[in-house]
Amino acid sequence: MSTETVAKLLSLQDIRYKAQKVLQKAESQSLKSFLYDPSKLPEVADFVVSVIQADFKGKYSTIPPHGRWQHFEVGNVPRLSQLVSKWEKEGVDSLEICKRVLDVTFVSVLLDAGAGDVWKYTDGKEAYGRSEGLAVASLRCFESGLFSSNPDFVYQVDGKALQALTSEKLGAGFQVTEQNPLAGVEGRATILRSLGKQLGSGRPSDFVGRIFPTGDFSKGLNVLELWSELQTLLIPIWPVRTSFEGQNLGDAWYLSTIDAIQPFHKLTQWLTYSLLIPFKSLLKVPVVNEELLTGLPEYRNGGLFVDLGVLTLRPEFSYATEYEPSSVTIVEWRAMTVVLLDKLLAFVNERLKPELSEPLSLAQMLEAGSWKSGRIIAKKLRPSTAGSPILIKSDGTLF
């Protein structure tokens, strides 16, 4: 591990680089927890293609990139779009509208760790669980001013309000009761309070002014610049799990399989994907280096490869065990998820080639294909919970 540096471990590029090393181990059946069967990948691709075709056949170019915006509008209710229209009618300028969307997206993604199998958020006549429920709940809390310290300016998130956010206030906003328990409420509130300390009196969206100090967006948004801003802001707020040379590394874990630290930075990547959408849709800012983002190593994408037999736990490991995020089992699974999503994208584009005007991006496949497919197969195999095939201990700050 002597060649490691903190900067490298916090970089986007190191995620794929290390995951490729894990794949090399898998190809010689040298993973410690899993057996790897690449012959099952075409079957996974067929399933994912069928899911994509069911929703988007003949209109593949309309597949949105993976991001939080779609979760806000679950049930075909244009909650965020209606807010944007309202602000436009009120004469709010496009930059401030974008900043408001960035603010709520920021908080919503940080709250988007696994909700558990029971919790639901009721919005109107509908109840939503899991990721979409968390999205709608966070949007409604944003609209109510929970994340703003200024009662005359509720449509913002600011550090002062976040520092004062208790788990009780957050739980109330998310309709948490004994009968409607949400996993990791205190962990979620702690993350937001930590973010508040980092922000001081500022807003999450203030990074826009640092990346574009003159307000000229014509140069485009470099994902690497955005990534640097986000890592600087967020690394100090994560619980210390793995550190290197005294520096917290966030979502990065030592993996004995490759005798190295395997970074993932999953929530920060999910945030990056999600923040790109308002830049593109509201400000029409071109984006470069987006391809450096990886597939997200979480249980929907990863579960797809377990449920369809690409990865199988070795006999000495049990599907009934709840594994720590730091365990070899979970870190191997997540690393393999990163590289298998890249492989899956190639298969999917090959199968859809006759129907596509241009190949699907990884972000589009994550949105319309792998994530949804993982959820569908989980519901089929585990109808009572639709949960993960491999159980992970969650504290509300990671998955």
UniProtKB/Swiss-Prot annotation:
It comes from the Eukaryota. GO terms for molecular function: catalytic activity. Pfam families: DUF1688. GO terms for cellular component: cytosol; nucleus. Belongs to the URC4/urg3 family. This is Protein urg3. It comes from Schizosaccharomyces pombe (strain 972 / ATCC 24843) (Fission yeast).
